[in-house]
Amino acid sequence: MNIRCARVDDLMSMQNANLMCLPENYQMKYYFYHALSWPQLSYIAEDHKGNVVGYVLAKMEEDPGEEPHGHITSLAVKRSYRRLGLANKMMDQTARAMVETYNAKYVSLHVRVSNRAALNLYKNTLKFEIVDTEPKYYADGEDAYAMRRDLAKWAEERNIEPADREAYTTAKTTDDKKKNRS
């Protein structure tokens, strides 16, 4: 197995993996948008023949006035390749790139409240926390958990150097700002 940064020529295989694994599907232009806007953030897992068996599609949220943070748009691993640590490795590579390239303080994602396997991965392996429940988030009306993983602490524990060390360490986190307003 090999984990590497996704390239434009991987996008069809990523979309195929998405169609096989998930009920939420995207048009090809959405994959291109991610690949061209944030080329460092999406990763694939490939088997020994070079076939894509999993991917993470990620982006940076660019809300003015908010601290830099990433978002996982989609994560999928084909069924026969699950429980091998591929999702964990791809998510860690994406998190590293978010910190090293964009000074991301945290990463967010949404997950179906019924997706127990994904919740277990996010909460227990990747240390995401549920921060909110968004009613009827999905097209079929199912609710989503909004989840978040602190990247500042994660990066510090792994000696990962942010894009701009001074800005990274002097910027207050959203939680610090909320505490100061209280």
Swiss-Prot record:
Pfam name, any one: Acetyltransf_1
Paired cysteines (S-S): none
N-acetyltransferase domain residues: 1-152
Enzyme class of the recorded protein, top EC level: transferase
GO molecular function: protein N-terminal-serine acetyltransferase activity; protein-N-terminal amino-acid acetyltransferase activity; protein-N-terminal-alanine acetyltransferase activity; protein-N-terminal-glutamate acetyltransferase activity
Catalytic activity: N-terminal glycyl-[protein] + acetyl-CoA = N-terminal N(alpha)-acetylglycyl-[protein] + CoA + H(+); N-terminal L-alanyl-[protein] + acetyl-CoA = N-terminal N(alpha)-acetyl-L-alanyl-[protein] + CoA + H(+); N-terminal L-seryl-[protein] + acetyl-CoA = N-terminal N(alpha)-acetyl-L-seryl-[protein] + CoA + H(+); N-terminal L-valyl-[protein] + acetyl-CoA = N-terminal N(alpha)-acetyl-L-valyl-[protein] + CoA + H(+)
Region annotation Disordered: where it falls in the sequence: 162-182
InterPro entries: Acyl_CoA_acyltransferase, Ard1-like, GNAT_dom
Domain of life: Eukaryota
A biological process term (GO) from this entry: multicellular organismal reproductive process
Knockout or disruption consequences: The majority of animals die within five days following dauer-like arrest, but surviving animals grow to the L4 larval developmental stage or adulthood. Animals display a dauer-like phenotype in response to pheromone and starvation, form dauer alae and have a constricted pharynx. Unlike dauer defective animals, these animals are not temperature sensitive and do not complete dauer morphogenesis. Animals have an increased propensity to accumulate fat. RNAi-mediated knock-down also induces a dauer-like phenotype and fat accumulation. However, knock-down does not influence the lifespan of animals.
Record EC number: 2.3.1.255
Tissue expression: Expressed in head and tail hypodermal cells, hypodermal seam cells, pharynx, intestine and head and tail neurons.
Keywords for this protein: Acyltransferase, Transferase
Cited Gene3D superfamilies: 3.40.630.30
Any one Gene Ontology cellular component term annotated for this protein: NatA complex
Keyword Acyltransferase appears in the UniProt entry: yes
Subunit structure and binding partners: Component of the N-terminal acetyltransferase A (NatA) complex.
Family note: Belongs to the acetyltransferase family. ARD1 subfamily.
Stated role: Catalytic subunit of the N-terminal acetyltransferase A (NatA) complex which displays alpha (N-terminal) acetyltransferase activity. Plays a role in regulating larval development, metabolism and longevity. Functions downstream or alongside daf-3, daf-12 and daf-16 in the dauer formation pathway. Functions upstream of daf-15 to enable animal development.
Record-given protein name: N-alpha-acetyltransferase daf-31
Primary gene name: daf-31
